[in-house]
Amino acid sequence: MKDVIKFHAEWCSPCRYYKTVWNEAKEKHGAVHNFIEVDIDNDNTGLAEKFGVRSVPTTVVVKENKDFQKQVGALAYGDLEKLIKG
């Protein structure tokens, strides 16, 4: 099981586009992976700092609580699929 984390903000235009792609992937893979959404303006978890998030949207996929891949920008559905499967 992987943690798929989306860092976003309400004021971010690309984040609004990406929400549709994210929800589609979450619907398809949500039973297998943990999908976590973090609003960087209200992040009291410290996750943005932990993963070095400097812009939104950013997607991080964590494998087995250690190795992770990070992609900055609003991804197309196929690119998000590759990141999750990678």
Go through the PLM ranges and name each one:
Residues 1-10:
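Short active-site neighborhood of thiol/selenol oxidoreductases, capturing the structured segment around
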Residues 7, 26, 31-45:
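Thiol-based oxidoreductase modules, predominantly thioredoxin-like and allied folds used
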Residues 12-15, 59:
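The canonical Cys-X-X-Cys-His
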Residues 13, 23, 41, 68:
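Nucleotide phosphate-binding site architecture
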Residues 13, 42-43, 75-78:
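Short alpha-helical
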Residues 16-29:
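Typically the conserved alpha-helix immediately C-terminal to a functionally engaged Cys/Sec
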Residues 50-54:
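A short glycine-leucine-enriched loop at secondary-structure breakpoints
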Residues 55, 60-86:
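Non-catalytic, surface beta->alpha helical segment in thiol-disulfide oxidoreductase systems
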